[in-house]
Regions:
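Basic, amphipathic alpha-helical recognition segments used for DNA target recognition
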Residues: 1, 52-59, 88-95, 142-204
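Low-complexity, Lys/Gly-biased intrinsically disordered segments
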Residues: 41-91, 107-109, 126-127
Length: 259
């Protein structure tokens, strides 16, 4: 459906698809002209491209594990931190302020253990107003136990002879922000799922390593600066409230603070 420019009424978007264009899916969203145009722009890039599946050396699905509250530990399992969808920040990267702990089978924990440079993909989740497919880059892991990831996520290891993980991260993050993942998802029982076969067919523009580093560092630095400004703005806004109440004789410090 497409929004009319004149009002908020949904009006049908009509277009045609040649039979030889059809692949293994009949979802009309996948064949929308705007998506075809986006694919063409990427494919015709002068720098050259390769498919995402050719840019990685490994991809593995996650594991949710067992709840420590009602699981009886045994030597085959170990307590791990488990990164999940809620640890993804929509505008930045991973947020480790609330990381779950679960028992994971040791044989699986070894395969799933995250390390610096790994990329996580949100393959299931989303919301009515948010597509699935958010991207995260594993950097520092400030934990005293192994860190794995849930079954709603997928881990990729980048072929570092071809690409910098930081570049793949900012590239896929940019595609997510412009709505690319909208076209390669489907929905069942309220949960959106990323079509991984289509995801790994994403064309990755392949500049030189020097250019990859330049692009990645600039993007990451800019997002860090934006995050800092956001935190500063929150502090300023809170100080305004404190000032106003203070001028009115309402002291929120010490015993007079509510809650």
């Amino acid at each position: 459906m497409k929004k009319s420019n004149r009002n908020s009424i949904d009006t049908p978007e009509t277009f045609f698809v040649w039979s030889n264009e059809l692949q293994d899916r009949f979802d009309p969203f996948f064949y929308r002209p705007v998506f075809k145009k986006l694919l063409a722009v990427i494919a015709n890039n002068k720098t050259g491209t390769i498919h995402l599946k050719e840019a990685i050396i490994n991809s593995v699905a996650g594991e949710w594990g067992e709840d420590p509250i009602d699981f009886e530990p045994n030597p085959d399992y170990e307590l791990c931190y488990v990164v999940r969808n809620t640890n993804f920040h929509n505008d930045f990267n991973l947020d480790f302020s609330d990381v779950a702990q679960r028992y994971i089978k040791k044989s699986k924990a070894e395969k799933l253990a995250l390390k610096k440079g790994d990329i996580l993909i949100e393959k299931s989740g989303g919301s009515p107003i948010q597509p699935v497919g958010r991207i995260a880059l594993v950097d520092d892991l400030p934990f005293d136990k192994p860190v794995v990831f849930s079954n709603f996520l997928q881990k990729m290891e980048v072929n570092k002879e071809l690409f910098l993980p930081e570049y793949i991260f900012v590239y896929l993050q940019a595609l997510y922000k412009i709505g690319y993942m909208d076209f390669i998802q489907n929905q069942t029982t309220g949960i959106k799922n990323l079509r991984l076969d289509d995801f790994f067919k994403i064309l990755i523009i392949k500049p030189s390593m020097a250019e990859q580093k330049k692009v990645a560092l600039k993007a990451i630095k800019s997002r860090e600066e934006a995050k800092g400004l956001l935190e500063k703005a929150k502090t300023i806004l809170a100080s305004i409230d404190t000032f106003v109440l203070g001028e009115l004789g309402i002291d929120l410090s010490g015993e007079n603070r509510a809650g």
